[in-house]
């Protein structure tokens, strides 16, 4: 299932159970990749927000893994033997995000610490929803 359909199904499952908070699995690398995707493919500086409120559904989406790198998440999944679900989206693996992931790997060889610098820029740049006040709520 593709991301938008999956998120819609998760939001509906929450509402069906009388819940209103959804923890999404976006991590550090997702934020860096999203910023670069927006910059390169849309010509804008932007990234998803750490906390998003969907007022039409009264659902709060949180991203508690934002400060955790993808490799750390993968290591924890393996170490704790957590079950995983295969992505059945037909575009999986052949996406713009995958292109950006490969680009970052290449750039990191010549510019060590690039991901850290980009993530730092996300935190310092006045992106909506990334300010300290919003994050403390």
Task: Annotate each language-model stretch with its function.
Residues 82-137:
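The feature marks non-catalytic terminal segments
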Residues 1-72, 118, 135:
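Active-site adenylate/phosphate-handling loop in enzymes that bind or generate adenylated species
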Residues 72-74, 87:
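Short glycine-rich, acidic/polar surface loops and turns
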């Amino acid at each position: 299932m593709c991301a938008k359909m999956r998120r819609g199904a998760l939001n509906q499952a929450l509402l069906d159970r009388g819940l209103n908070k959804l923890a999404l699995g976006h991590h550090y690398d997702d934020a860096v990749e999203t910023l670069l995707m927006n910059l390169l493919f849309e010509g804008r500086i932007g990234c998803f927000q750490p906390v998003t409120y969907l007022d039409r559904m009264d659902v709060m989406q949180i991203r508690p893994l934002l400060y955790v790198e993808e490799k750390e998440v993968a290591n924890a999944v393996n170490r704790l033997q957590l079950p995983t679900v295969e992505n059945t989206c037909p575009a999986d693996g052949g996406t713009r995000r995958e292109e950006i992931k490969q680009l970052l790997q290449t750039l990191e060889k010549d510019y060590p610490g690039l991901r850290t610098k980009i993530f730092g820029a996300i935190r310092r740049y006045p992106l909506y929803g990334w300010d300290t006040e919003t994050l403390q709520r």
